[in-house]
A protein has these predicted regions:
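Detector for C-terminal structural segments
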Residues: 18, 25, 344-375, 424-433, ...
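N-terminal lobe/hinge region of extracytoplasmic solute-binding protein
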Residues: 67-128, 161, 236
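Gly/Pro-rich hinge or "lid" segments in bacterial periplasmic/extracellular proteins
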Residues: 88, 99-100, 107-111, 210-267, ...
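Aromatic- and charge-enriched surface segment that lines or borders ligand/interaction sites
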Residues: 123-169, 194, 332
Length: 571
């Protein structure tokens, strides 16, 4: 599969993420059979020190120039705080234009460590006294939204207002439990840039909490939920780039330097042009010079772009987990979901995607962590195979009728939504279709255009799909973004919700990790919504003189505010 659908919930987390060990992509480059190659390993120091991004000093790069890039879908909702707007494509394209809401006041480095972004935050401290946890920080008084509204305590309160009510608040958000634990947010001694947050109960998952902000106008629910549909309203944003033009009919977004940007580093590029393209189009676009760089994971793209004059292929480890994902409000029978997971041969699915490029990796068993991260455990149920799946269905009252099981006159089955016409995507569906048929489960292919992904996934207009989520650097913190009833539209388990709540109340980091793994094991057995089957590599084909751009582990274009100001062209 050459286009990976990726969400990364890290931008909704509360702050610092713990340092995890990172993986080394070994034996990269051309092999004897001319595959992209690569193997997941565990040498953190070598990987972080040898990122393939054409690293260059900011001061040595050309001032000016244009960078032409593509994503699989732009919009239609450009508010990256909403369920439908929060997609990797939108974050990639506009996340760096809205730093306070997308990545907050801290930057994430390749190894997963946070550091203060002094363009927004000058001082920070958190402490717990007599059981009461407080955080205080000073916002850079130069920080403003593009319409001149200050980024101050009112902006932090606005973010709190939007998220504190969870999924029942009337805002179309991905719920974030942390914000509901805040008791108060106030200015210290009347200074609107000196913020104090008091927690109702201590929150121990992070040493940096509450360092996000939203334009106060976004408290208006209509503006928040629908105001950004086909309208990238950057007057409510703040960052080094702003929107120069949005061409809705051509699906082209042009970013230009923000004249209101106060940061020490100014953008190097005159323009970043984003275009919505499907795999065939972006492969051709790179080959004919219409694009300056493309990111991919599949053999078809590699075979198209390899050996092109004036370009190179930069290789890295994806910090993602590919998964089979149910919408449990549509596929409501737990037995059917559990049987599907039992019948799925995950190794075969991974081979469909990665064997053609010669990539090797251990089978992932978690949505919460990469196999090389501290605390990782394989939490996928071990009772698998067609016979195990049949037993689950029969114990739930299903009986075989012809080739498939039935219950109450309904065939055991569901639709899998796929996107585009990529050969690997089709092969993956066909592979899973045959696997499930052996267990008496019938699946159909709800194939849709690539451009529909954002709206379909964001509004959960599917029964099941092949998805991919970004992996956070803090295993324990990630559990709340996958395994609560609130995050899964009311589907879940009360015992699991209590365990998730206990994680943030537990001070010991080791105990947090143990609880998070316990949560994941229980959820896969008792709820069965996410089934991981691959992590995979990441390749970027780029023009050779493009600097500071390429696979960077946990440091992405939407987790590090310095990313885009450092991207430029060598003379």
């Amino acid at each position: 599969m050459n286009v990976q659908r990726t969400f990364n919930r890290r931008t909704l987390l509360t702050g610092t993420v713990a340092l995890g060990t990172v993986g080394l992509l070994a034996a990269c480059g051309g092999s004897k059979d001319d595959k992209a190659g690569g193997k997941a390993a565990t040498n953190a120091e070598d990987l972080v020190n040898n990122l393939q991004i054409n690293k260059q000093d900011y001061s040595s790069l050309k001032k000016g120039g244009e960078l032409k890039l593509s994503v699989s879908a732009l919009g239609p909702d450009f508010n990256t705080m909403t369920q439908s707007g929060y997609t990797s494509s939108n974050l990639e394209a506009v996340g760096g234009c809205n730093i306070p809401a997308t990545m907050g006041f801290y930057n994430l480095d390749p190894a997963g460590e946070d550091s203060m972004n002094k363009d927004f935050c000058l001082e920070y401290k958190v402490e717990t006294k007599d059981g009461v946890q407080t955080a205080e920080y000073k916002i850079n008084p130069k920080a403003v939204f593009n319409d001149g509204t200050p980024v101050d305590v009112e902006a932090v309160k606005a973010y709190w207002e939007i998220y504190k009510g969870g999924g029942d608040s009337g805002y179309s958000i991905i719920p974030n439990p942390f914000w509901g634990q805040i008791e108060s947010i106030e200015a210290v001694d009347g200074d609107k840039f000196h913020v104090k947050i008091t927690m109702a109960t201590p929150y121990y998952l992070s040493e940096v909490i509450g360092t996000y902000a939203a334009h106060p106008a976004l408290i208006d629910k209509e503006l928040f939920n629908t105001g950004f549909v086909d309208k990238p309203l950057d007057k409510y944003w703040s960052g080094p780039y702003k929107v120069g033009n949005w061409n809705s009919s051509e699906k082209t977004l042009t970013l230009v330097p923000n004249d209101k940007w106060w940061g020490e580093k100014k953008p190097l590029l005159d323009r970043i042009v984003w275009r919505q393209m499907d795999p065939d189009s972006y492969r051709a676009g790179f080959k004919n010079g219409e694009l300056d760089a493309i990111t991919f994971v599949g053999a078809a793209t590699y075979n198209t772009v390899k050996g092109q004059s004036g370009t190179d292929i930069r290789t890295g480890q994806r910090t993602n987990v590919d998964n089979l994902q149910f919408n449990a409000t549509r596929v409501t029978d737990l037995a059917l979901r559990r049987a599907t997971f039992a019948a799925t041969d995950r190794e075969q699915l991974a081979k469909v995607i990665y064997s053609q490029i010669g990539w090797e990796e251990p089978m992932p068993g978690s949505m919460l962590a990469m196999p090389f991260q501290k605390g990782y455990e394989d939490n996928v149920p071990k009772n698998s195979g067609a016979d195990a799946a049949k037993k689950i269905l029969e114990e739930a009252g299903y009986t075989m009728s012809g080739e498939y099981y039935q219950k109450d006159g309904k065939t055991a089955g569901f639709a899998i939504t796929t996107f585009g016409s990529d050969a690997t995507t089709n092969a993956k569906f066909q592979n899973l279709e045959q696997q499930l048929k052996k267990a008496g489960i019938k699946v159909t292919n709800d194939n849709q255009p690539d451009a529909n992904y954002n709206s379909v996934a964001g509004t959960k207009s599917y029964e099941c799909l092949f998805n991919s989520w970004g992996v956070g650097a803090n295993l324990a913190d990630s559990a709340q973004y996958f395994y609560t009833k609130d995050i899964n539209n009311g589907v879940g388990d009360d015992e699991i919700d209590k365990l998730v709540a206990k994680i943030s109340e537990t001070e010991s980091k080791d105990e947090q990790i143990k609880l998070a793994n316990q949560v994941e094991k229980l959820h896969m057995e008792k709820v069965a919504i996410y089934l991981p089957y691959a992590n995979g590599p990441e390749y970027t084909a780029a023009k050779s003189k493009l600097a500071n751009y390429g696979p960077s582990l946990f440091r992405t274009t939407y987790t590090n505010a310095e990313y885009w100001v450092n991207v430029g062209w060598q003379e």
